[in-house]
């Protein structure tokens, strides 16, 4: 709960990433329940940011932004499902689900969330072809349901080696936001906190 938008120091080095993540978090207030259908969603404001791909060197606040989205949505709309996972944990859970014959449970968990937040997606790099296809199909299922996918990486989508071209295209289809090292002014603010 320490990760919020209020305590994220932002400036020129990370403003686009901050504003995009914040818009996606605020979009949770636009979800509506409709009596005709059990659960219809309307997200006009932040849909241009979906999927959101935040990239930059380690230690600059990418994970903070993911957790800020998660905390905001969980606080303001506890009825919505938010899932934060590292790429390593996602891959380990996928492998375990394959081994134990529980792929249906895995798919239900990941493909039906309103907000899927995956940290350090570049670590999917060494996964097997079948795992990468599962990742691609998971992303498609979420996108087809107009739900949010937010990922972080230390490199651009086009620099993700050994990734399916279709997955790179999916990452690139929304907002790509770069976080660069902070300037002197931002460093000063961070040090004062």
Put a short name on every predicted segment.
Residues 1-18:
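Dynamic helix-loop-helix/coil hinge segments at AAA+ ATPase domain boundaries and subdomain interfaces
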Residues 39-66:
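Walker A/P-loop nucleotide-binding motif
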Residues 63-77:
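P-loop NTPase Walker A phosphate-binding motif
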Residues 79-113:
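Short glycine-rich substrate-engagement loop in P-loop NTPases that contacts/grips substrate
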Residues 95-99, 157-173:
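Short regulatory helix/loop adjacent to the ATP-binding pocket of P-loop NTPases
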Residues 119-121:
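Walker B catalytic acidic pair
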Residues 123-151, 155, 165-170:
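Conserved catalytic/switch belt of AAA+ P-loop NTPases
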Residues 174-186:
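Conserved AAA+ ATPase "SRH/arginine-finger" region at the nucleotide-binding site
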């Amino acid at each position: 709960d320490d990760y919020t938008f209020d305590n994220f120091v932002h400036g020129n080095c990370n403003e686009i990433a901050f504003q995009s993540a914040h818009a996606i978090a605020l979009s949770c207030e636009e979800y509506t329940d409709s009596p005709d259908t059990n659960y219809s969603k309307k997200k006009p404001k932040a849909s241009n940011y979906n999927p959101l791909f935040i990239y930059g060197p380690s230690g600059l606040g990418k994970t903070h932004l993911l957790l800020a989205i998660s905390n905001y949505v969980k606080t303001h709309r506890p009825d919505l499902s938010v899932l934060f996972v590292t790429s390593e944990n996602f891959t380990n859970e996928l492998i375990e689900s394959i081994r134990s014959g529980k792929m249906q449970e895995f798919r239900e968990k990941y493909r039906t969330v309103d907000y899927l937040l995956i940290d350090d997606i570049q670590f999917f790099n060494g996964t097997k072809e079948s795992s990468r296809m599962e990742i691609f199909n998971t992303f498609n299922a979420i996108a087809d349901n107009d739900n949010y996918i937010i990922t972080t990486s230390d490199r651009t989508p086009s620099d993700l080696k050994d990734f399916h071209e279709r997955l790179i295209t999916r990452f690139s289809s929304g907002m790509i936001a770069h976080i660069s090292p902070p300037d002197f002014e931002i460093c000063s603010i961070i040090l004062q906190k």
